[in-house]
């Protein structure tokens, strides 16, 4: 918000600071408050960034990883540095995440998804993961989770919160 404040001060557009800064910040705060007040168990998650020639686990130092942490999720890559260096099915199986989130990068989302299918999902152990068995494998919108969503930060937080905590989906929708 500090940079937005600076630019709005320079242009004399306090209205834009309120609209694009304070209002968006309030949307995020509303989502976080709802999640915290619900006192639901923190899910173990895995965040993957896939591209046409590979895939990396991402921790909470990544934009989407930080959002997951804000929402109370426990990212298995934060506790398992080996996942950040070398994505291994053995480590994923050992940690057995409840939710798997995938963000693609690069020009071709399909090529990134093909790489995942050929190199992770083709492993027979993949289908035994809790996240896969329960249908909690999510492909995230690149506009909301790879690039900074700017005026759509509130939507990004609501989207993740609804995936992490489906019981809150109606309440989260009411915040939109």
Predicted regions: what they are:
Residues 1-54, 77, 132-176:
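Extracytoplasmic substrate-binding proteins
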Residues 26, 33, 84-91, 119-128:
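Alpha-helical scaffolding within the catalytic cores
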Residues 38-41, 69, 93-95, 129-133:
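Extracellular/periplasmic catalytic domains that process cell-envelope and extracellular macromolecules
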Residues 50-51, 97, 105-107, 142:
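Solvent-exposed coil/turn segments that connect beta secondary-structure elements
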Residues 55-57, 85, 109-113, 148-149:
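Extracytoplasmic/secreted cell-surface and envelope-processing proteins
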Residues 56-85:
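Alpha-helical, coiled-coil/dimerization segments enriched in small aliphatic residues
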Residues 89-102:
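Proline-aspartate-enriched helix->loop->beta-strand connector
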Residues 102-120:
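A ligand-binding cleft/hinge motif common to bilobed small-molecule-binding domains
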């Amino acid at each position: 918000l500090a940079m937005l404040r600076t630019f709005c001060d320079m242009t004399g557009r306090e209205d834009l600071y309120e609209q694009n800064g304070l209002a968006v910040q309030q949307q995020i705060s509303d989502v976080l408050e709802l999640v915290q007040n619900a006192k639901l168990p923190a899910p173990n998650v895995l965040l993957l960034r896939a591209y046409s020639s590979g895939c990396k686990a991402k921790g909470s130092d990544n934009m989407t990883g930080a959002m997951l942490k804000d929402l109370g999720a426990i990212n298995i890559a934060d506790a398992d540095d080996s996942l950040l260096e070398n994505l291994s099915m053995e480590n994923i199986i050992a940690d057995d995440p409840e939710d798997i989130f995938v963000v693609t990068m690069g020009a071709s989302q399909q090529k990134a998804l093909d790489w995942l299918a050929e190199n992770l999902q083709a492993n027979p152990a993949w289908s035994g993961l809790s996240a896969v068995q329960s249908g909690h494998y999510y492909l995230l919108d690149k506009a909301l989770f790879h690039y900074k969503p700017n005026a759509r930060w509130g939507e990004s937080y609501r989207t993740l919160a609804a995936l992490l905590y489906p019981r809150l989906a109606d309440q989260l929708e009411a915040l939109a």
